[in-house]
């Protein structure tokens, strides 16, 4: 049995190491090492092998966290995190958030859900379940661990807004039964659950309404405007602009989002 492991076993909560030092079981050096290990933040990122999740995993590792990356690979890819697999502080797990998960973490970032219409309309029932059941399972985990948790929501909670730009106080204009509803309403329901857990269980939550993010590792065929423009430009094709070209859209680079 290694000294570091012995240190973890014998360290009293208030730092009174007494007999353990006197009999030579542990040393001040192993105590310091064990305390440093204990203070290292352990973070769960669901959807961590996706476009956004993989960049978040990189940033958390750079900040000195232990990272558990969770993904079912529906739209995520192991290739997105292949360069992280040799990092001893990174763990990759294949798991679907619609099923309960039992891990020990300090913080949770819930990014699991297909975000492109092509992907989320492929199986709309599964999309809704991912948003709703996934939120319930991750909130339940956060409640049990008293962990901080962040929900990756979306500007799509505003639906087809009649207010531009949209303040956070705007409730939106959403079609509850349309083809996009599996995503829009699923994310709205997830936000409801997050705020109810805060009110009812005093859980530490954050909700981020993400919008039109682009950058390395975005799926080239996700049907969104930036990827469409890039693919058409690389092929030497005219860029497709729908309607009269009067639309406005805000974009966010992935590094800025993670920051």
Tell where the protein language model's regions lie, with residue ranges.
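Serine/threonine-rich, low-complexity intrinsically disordered segments
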Residues: 11-13, 27-32
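Internal intein/HINT superfamily modules and their associated LAGLIDADG
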Residues: 1-3, 238
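Juxtamembrane/membrane-water interface recognition
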Residues: 20-21, 96
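Glycine/proline-rich active-site loop of Rossmann-fold NAD(P)-dependent oxidoreductases
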Residues: 188, 213-228, 235-238, 242-249, ...
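N-terminal Rossmann-like NAD(P)+-binding domain of SDR-like oxidoreductases, especially those catalyzing
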Residues: 29-213, 233, 243, 254-255
């Amino acid at each position: 049995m290694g000294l570091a492991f012995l240190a973890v076993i014998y360290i009293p909560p208030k730092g009174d190491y007494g007999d353990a030092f006197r009999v030579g079981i542990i040393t001040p050096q192993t105590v310091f090492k064990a305390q440093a290990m204990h203070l290292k933040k352990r973070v769960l990122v669901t959807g961590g092998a996706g476009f956004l999740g993989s960049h978040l995993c990189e940033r958390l590792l750079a900040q000195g966290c232990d990272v558990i990356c969770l993904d079912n690979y529906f739209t995520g890819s192991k290739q997105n995190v292949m360069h992280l697999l040799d990092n001893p502080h990174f763990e990759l797990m294949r798991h679907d958030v619609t099923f309960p998960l039992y891990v020990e973490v300090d913080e949770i970032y819930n990014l699991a859900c297909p975000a492109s219409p092509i992907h989320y309309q492929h199986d709309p029932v599964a999309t809704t379940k991912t948003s709703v059941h996934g939120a319930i399972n991750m909130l339940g985990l956060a409640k049990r661990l008293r962990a901080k948790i962040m929900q990756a929501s979306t500007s799509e909670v505003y639906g087809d807004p009649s207010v531009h730009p949209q303040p956070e106080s705007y409730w939106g204009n959403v079609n509850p039964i349309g083809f996009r509803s599996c995503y829009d309403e699923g994310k709205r329901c997830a936000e409801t659950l997050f705020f109810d857990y805060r009110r009812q269980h005093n859980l530490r939550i954050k909700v981020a309404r993400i919008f039109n993010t682009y950058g390395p590792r975005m799926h080239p065929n996700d049907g969104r405007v930036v990827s469409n423009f890039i693919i058409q430009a690389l092929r030497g094709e005219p860029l497709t602009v729908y309607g009269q070209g009067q639309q406005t859209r805000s974009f966010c680079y992935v590094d800025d989002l993670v920051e």
